[in-house]
Amino acid sequence: MIVIADTGPLNYLVLIGAVDVLQPLYKRVIVPQAVVQELDDAAAPAAVRTWIAQPPVWLELRPDPPSDPTLDFLDAGEKAALTLAESLNADELLIDEQTGRAEAERRHLRVTGTLGVLANAHLAGLRDFDQSLARLRSTNFRLHPDVERLVRRRIAAAKKES
């Protein structure tokens, strides 16, 4: 499985102490250099900068792909992550920002955000969704109530199927 991550999901998963769910869920996660730079930026939280300074073995750092000028409306990390996901024919792109998600979906990429990762971790028995969500709310993560309802319905439906 090829999974590419943008800055947002990694940032929030580090902040809530749940970044370790990525390895059992996806085995390996690939990030472009632009995402590494955003995670290591002076404006990034100290915990995030510390984490990316010594990335786990399952996090594969890649050079940025050639720039796609049609994506100049996105920030550098989103643009590089989306372009890398396209170039590698990724199975999934981890991205939170709505404009980037919409563009990725328009390009027929499968997207999952921080909340989706937490839902998958819950369904895999790795984390309690409500506890993870409470931690996420203690950050500056913006969560629309409709999105939360949708994810909760997805969790309930998946539990019924199993």
Give the location of each predicted region.
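Short, ordered loop/turn segments at secondary-structure junctions
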Residues: Q98-T99, G116
